[in-house]
């Protein structure tokens, strides 16, 4: 009986592709909105958000390649599952502590988070950015009073 190495190599290649973490790849910053935690009169300065919307970042195993502060060399990725209170470094939980009538689940839903928990990618980067996943192709992060939506490319 004669065996071919091609099917074995093919299966190994498919398994390797399937093992890639879901967050790796190129993501486009699709939009930015003022974070629900903003409570000062007026709106925060949108100049930074305007420079980021439309840009891309690429998450690789060894770096996050992106504009300005979004870039990071040598990230220490950790995927965690968190409740709505934990989104955006606990901003919703802080709002709830300040005002007991705040419904954290409703706040999260305004940004697309409808489940009891969400997957979040902690990067371990100096910029302290975490990426929270609405679904496999949509993630969000907070930076300077804005929530940015990323779409996988």
What are these regions (language model features)?
Residues 13-15:
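N-terminal signal peptide c-region/cleavage motif recognized by signal peptidases
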Residues 33-36, 59-129:
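Contiguous, well-ordered beta-strand patches that form the walls/edges
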Residues 71-86, 133-153:
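Edge beta-strand at a domain terminus
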Residues 20-42:
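Tryptophan-anchored aromatic micro-motifs
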Residues 29, 64-67, 139-142:
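Short hydrophobic/aromatic-rich beta-strand segments that constitute the beta-sheet cores
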Residues 1-7:
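Bacterial N-terminal signal peptides that target proteins for export
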Residues 40-60:
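Short, flexible N-terminal segments of the mature chain
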